[in-house]
Amino acid sequence: ASGLFFAVDPGANASLGGMASTRASGTAAVRYGTMRETVMGLTVVTPDGRIVRTGTRARKSASGLDLTRLYVGSEGLLGIITEVQLRLFGLPEHVVAAVCQFGSLRAAMDTVIATLQLGVPVARIELLNDVQMDACIRYSKLDEFEARPTLFIEFHGSESAVAEQVATVEALALDNGGSGFRYAHQPEDRSRLWKARHSCYHANLAMHPGWSSMGTDACVPISALVECITETEAAIRESGLYAPIVGHVGDGNFHLGIIYDDTDPTARRKAEALAEDVALRAIRLGGTCTGEHGVGLHRIGQIEIEHGEAIELMRDIKRALDPRGIMNPGKMLQM
């Protein structure tokens, strides 16, 4: 559709069905929301072969149970999604990206929190720690930057609104000891920055060729973000592992890319222990073990801790809709 865009900024290998099934998110979720808010309706094939249409084109509805939300994030346990009806957004009149670097991770996070508390409608605000920036500089040739804690920020709106947003956030960054903004006004310059951000996974692997990556997906309330990331950095140091931090911190979501030698059983155990530590810390602080990647096989035990007795209700729903257990067995829920 002319003049519209899909705001849930997909990763390189994403599919719409997969994004709906895992309730995925992305760099623009802080302003535009996740797949939960973006999916308006679905066509689903149920385990008994019925083809069911959920949702309407209306922006809101108080009619019946919200089956769309039931299926979004269900990871194929309750049916197969064959069609997705999406909400699109108008292309912003003006777009500016900026990069700001800091002397400490705490200063960068304080800038994020102050920005959100003031209600500045940033379109994206991404945090990369010094280790992650070092990998990105080497892999994506970002030679104009230093290996320091960094925020990648993007602003959308009218020209005057964007100018006001930029001035507010830059002042907050300077108050926290940040560098002046480096701007990317042209589409090709913005694309270069966001391509580097999306290439973090490959940048991390390039630091240790032949090794494997184990990801984490913790998401916590903004009020717990500083505590969670600070404790996580300490855990990384204690582990001795190479594990850069990058995150969509505008909604409290951050990732570790734990790079380890998969041929070394000790290294794998240490990587698994660190990933488990991050997930359990997020849960303890009122967050979740997975903000956008989903549960799959590896987080089954973690969501049982996170949801407690509610897990049994989830199992009841699974049994009611799929009594023979034919839909994606063994994933998400231990039946």
Residues covered by each model-derived region:
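Conserved, mostly hydrophobic/aromatic
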Residues: 76, 256, 322
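Short coil/turn segments at secondary-structure boundaries
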Residues: 11, 184-185, 329-332
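FAD-binding subdomain of flavoenzyme oxidoreductases
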Residues: 1-126, 327
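Alpha-helix capping/hinge segments and adjacent helical runs
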Residues: 283-295, 308, 323-327
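Activity-critical C-terminal alpha-helical subdomain
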Residues: 50, 300-335
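C-terminal substrate-recognition/cap domain of FAD-linked oxidoreductases
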Residues: 86-90, 96-274, 281, 285
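Small/polar glycine-rich anion-binding or flexible loop at a beta-alpha turn
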Residues: 131-132, 249-253, 294-301, 335
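A short, flexible low-complexity segment enriched in Lys/Arg and Gly/Pro that occurs
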Residues: 1-6, 40-61, 223-227, 262-273, ...
